[in-house]
A protein has these predicted regions:
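Electrostatic, structured charged patches in enzyme active sites and in nucleic-acid/phosphate-binding
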Residues: 1-199
């Protein structure tokens, strides 16, 4: 994916998580303006921070695409003096999304700044690494035939390749969502990796 603009570090962290989350196809910033009437019947408008389109899986089989409109806010803002105004906006956004078969969600630092973010930050730099096609094929076929394995076992079984090269190729494949590991844990040589269907 390309660059998605963000207005705060929390928004940047949200994008980082979504970029590595399984099934996320689209991350759009400030996608649409929603018009609504407030309780004084004044026309107001509200622009969600992001539109996410993700593929939903059931028993590892992709079933449908889901659209989610997202607001990213610190808890202090959600509970601050603007809280009543925000709640009003969010209610209208929720109704607006529901009528169209979509979802609206609010993410705070509690949902964003988690171990999933630390893993995503670890993997992000590997996304743009050039692939080592020979090694990628060897790793994928090893996991396809042998099931989930610790990265150190993958390194041992592919002993004809330097182990640091195997490790960085595994990181690149994880960063590009070609293979899976625990989304809440940093990746080490003791991490279990697998094809998505075995995850």
């Amino acid at each position: 994916g390309g660059f998605v603009k963000f207005e705060s570090r929390l928004e940047r962290d949200f994008i980082t998580i979504m970029a590595l989350r399984r099934g996320v196809r689209v991350i759009d910033a400030q996608p649409i303006k929603i018009g609504y009437f407030d309780e004084d019947f004044r026309l107001r408008s509200y622009t969600p921070d992001f539109h996410i389109v993700r593929r939903v899986y059931h028993n590892n089989i992709p079933t449908h695409l889901e659209s989610i409109f997202v607001e990213v806010k610190f808890t202090s803002e959600l509970n601050g003096p603007k809280s009543p105004d925000l709640i009003g906006k969010f209610k209208h956004a929720q109704r607006w999304a529901k009528r169209r078969g979509w979802r609206f969600a609010v993410y705070s630092e509690d949902e964003i700044r988690t171990p999933e973010l630390h893993r995503a930050e670890q993997l992000m730099p590997f996304r743009r690494n050039p692939e080592n096609t020979k090694l990628e094929t060897a790793i994928a076929s090893l996991l396809r035939t042998g099931g989930p394995k610790l990265i150190q076992n993958v390194q041992q079984e592919l002993g004809n390749f330097p182990s640091n090269l195997v490790f960085s190729e595994v990181l690149r494949m994880l960063a590009n969502r070609q293979i899976a590991s625990d989304p809440m844990s940093l990746v080490t040589e003791n991490s279990l990796v697998s094809m998505w269907q075995d995850f």
